[in-house]
Amino acid sequence: MSESFDRLGYLLFANALSDDDLGMLREVCDKLLEEPAQDGGAGLHNIGLGDARRFLRHRHADFPALDEFVTSERIDRIVRPCLDSDSVLFNEQFVVKGAGKGASFAWHQDSAYVGFDHKPYLTVWIALDDTTEENGCVYLLPRNLETDPGIDAHEWQEDSRELNGYFGDDPGRPMVCPAGTVVAFSSRTLHRSGPNGTDRPRRAYIAQYSVEPIRNPETGDLKRFAKPVRRAA
């Protein structure tokens, strides 16, 4: 594992995507946005807020170029420095904050949403638009994964339909970055995002990777995906 990743809980990869990959992700996202805003939330998840906060998830297999991308050698070059291991795709989704009304997202660890004990995994957050504090960038709380590897207590916020795992005063580090930047952070790293107060949507793509398939320990059922990532030469 990278010493910086271990010490901070995240790594930033500037200019990580080619123009072709960035264009492909934007095209797929925009095509999915043409679907009704009630994008399966009632049956698949309960954290979407319609046009204000959309989660367009688990659709990579519908788009061959995206299907290739999420397990590609290009992804391995991002994931391996963080996990120091082969990896499998665990989950993926586009997250879009609507123009002028895009909802914020409370402090949480991604692991808190899994629902059972599991090894930490990696979230690869990709900016599809230039990301600012005005349009809802991600904020991170640095975390030493060696000394503080656990899952914090979270509380469900019914009004905003989300978990909250931090009630302190630290605003976190804003990940202000141009489109094509990748922020890779541990599923144990606390993060949040602000509201989008601009006149344009803020789009991001999130793919998550684990060193092993994530299974429910009681049933043995696979949680989402376990697609091997191709090792980079």
Language-model-detected regions and their locations in the chain:
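Short, conserved beta-strand element in jelly-roll/cupin
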Residues: 115-133, 176, 208-213
